[in-house]
Amino acid sequence: MKNKLTIIFFIILTIFFHHCSKSDGDKIFAKYADGQLTRSDLVDRFGGKKVNTILSSGSYLNTIQDLVYKKIIFDHHSDLIDNEYIKNDIQRISNDQKLKRVLDYLVNNYSLNDSIISFISTAELSKYTIQDIVVTHRLSYSQHKDRSKKEAHTIANRIKERIETQQITFDEAVSIYVEHPSIKLRNGILGPLRYGKLPKELNDVIWQSSPGQIIGPVETKFGYHIFRTVKRENIDDPKQQNRKKSIKKEIKGGRYGFLDEYTDLQAEQWFHAFGGEIHVDEIDTLWQIADSLGLFVTPNGISIHSLDKTNYNSPLAKINNQNLPISWFIDQAKKQGTYDKSNFVKAYFLYNTLKDMLHRYSAIMWFEKNKTIFDHKKTHRLIKIKQEDYLFDTFMKQEMEKDSTLTNSVILNRLAIQYDLEINDHLPQLN
């Protein structure tokens, strides 16, 4: 009978402590105007195990003070921080973290086909010499100010046709159409070249070609290429043998351009899935107007913010049935990465920056839609932590710039008084 009573007592005691633990589970450590700091806030930042370690230490009050000040500034940042663009900074932190999750997902799920590794392994054992003609345009890296992308593509097709119909030889085509003097002096000859030295689009085509073959137009960042394969040579280099394992590692590290191609392709697919269109001719026109208005400032070029001075309101792109003029991109630049500081010395950089911003925007929308792939709660907790830290640092810097004699403790004491801060200095009972 005594044993039964003892068991019942322990059961009641267990239930009692469990109830107390639950009721004390979100203990309030501090209160302030319109807010409070609870155990849940600490768990969100540090995790449950680390919180117990912190709360059992002699300096736990310092941790609570640090966090409650960050929470006050986060909750009242619109009143405390003078910067009118602070909302953009907060949004940028959120966007950048979501994009990081997407990129991590892509990289972690990138699987290499054995045929790719075999192709590179074989390609590294040969060198190619080619004869190359590049037709440039305003949006290519090698810039031609008087030619649109569409015009360049038309010219490239015409060159290929004239060569194939034997109206001109390839050598004659080089003398007529090659734009760069030093390349013209070499009769358009490039090489011998090892695999990986040229843009990926060219590498892949060249190393699948045979001597005498004429290929093109192939688009790269330099323009449209028409090339003739002149010679293929074998490389007798023991270092290039049996490299399949290291090649796989190098590809996943970004070499050869396969990883970039994969992530760009995914971003392009998401962009189109959301009804995305990019209007190349309008971007070209915007650049020409900006250039004609003298917005180019040496040596930096044209800033993204100065593009609103063009008064060019035609849509540069479209997504989710929304037409996007340059004002949309300027607004997004404030909320994405470091685009807010973008300057363009060539139309090539303008075009690619706008394209990158559209891809980022699409990737973030894709993140928001995929609640099963991504842990949204965990991501949002991390975003909030980074936003709190950023706002705290911004506020402290602002106050010290106003009065360089202020110390951290003085600034925070003023904050405590302003928002009626009360901290519970009793050691909390651990759960």
Walk through the language-model features, giving the residues of each.
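Peptidyl-prolyl cis-trans isomerase
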Residues: 21-37, 43-431
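C-terminal motif of bacterial Sec signal peptides marking the signal peptidase cleavage site
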Residues: 16-19
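Sec-dependent signal peptide recognition
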Residues: 3-10
